[in-house]
Swiss-Prot record:
Quaternary data: Interacts with the ligand binding domain of the thyroid receptor (TR) (in vitro). Requires the presence of thyroid hormone for its interaction. Interacts with transcriptional regulator SEHBP. Interacts with nucleosomes.
Organism this protein belongs to: Homo sapiens (Human)
Gene Ontology terms describing biological process: chromatin organization
PTM annotation (Phosphothreonine): residues: T10
GO molecular function: chromatin binding; nuclear thyroid hormone receptor binding; nucleosomal DNA binding
Functional summary from the UniProt entry: Binds to nucleosomes, regulating chromatin structure and consequently, chromatin-dependent processes such as transcription, DNA replication and DNA repair. Affects both insulin and glucagon levels and modulates the expression of pancreatic genes involved in insulin secretion. Regulates the expression of the glucose transporter SLC2A2 by binding specifically to its promoter region and recruiting PDX1 and additional transcription factors.
UniProt-annotated location(s): Nucleus
Protein name, as recorded: High mobility group nucleosome-binding domain-containing protein 3
Length: 99
C-alpha cells in the first residue's frame, strides 16, 4: 500500500492541495457507542451453618468407617496394609495345597 504524501513533500505537481488539511481521525474505540450498564449481580445463597459438634458421613469418609468396623471383626487387614499372622498362614496353606 502506498504511503501518504505529507504536505511538505507535495511541492511538485499538486501544489494547490498543500493548503487542504486532512480531517482528524477518532479511534474506533472512542467513536463506538458506550457499553450498556451491567445488571446487578444476584445475591448468592448462603449455606445454612451447621453445628460444629454434628458429624456427617460423606463419600469416602463413610466407606472408611465401614472398613474400620470390618477391621474390628478381624476380617480386614490392619491399617498399615500389613496382613495379620493368621491370615498370612491361611494364604500360604492354600498356595501349598494347589501345588
Amino acid at each position: 500500500m502506498p504511503k501518504r504524501k505529507s504536505p511538505e513533500n507535495t511541492e511538485g505537481k499538486d501544489g494547490s492541495k498543500v493548503t487542504k488539511q486532512e480531517p482528524t481521525r477518532r479511534s474506533a474505540r472512542l467513536s463506538a457507542k458506550p457499553a450498556p450498564p451491567k445488571p446487578e449481580p444476584k445475591p448468592r445463597k448462603t449455606s445454612a451453618k451447621k453445628e460444629p459438634g454434628a458429624k456427617i458421613s460423606r463419600g469416602a469418609k463413610g466407606k472408611k468407617e465401614e472398613k474400620q468396623e470390618a477391621g474390628k471383626e478381624g476380617t480386614a487387614p490392619s491399617e498399615n496394609g500389613e496382613t495379620k499372622a493368621e491370615e498370612a498362614q491361611k494364604t500360604e496353606s492354600v498356595d501349598n495345597e494347589g501345588e
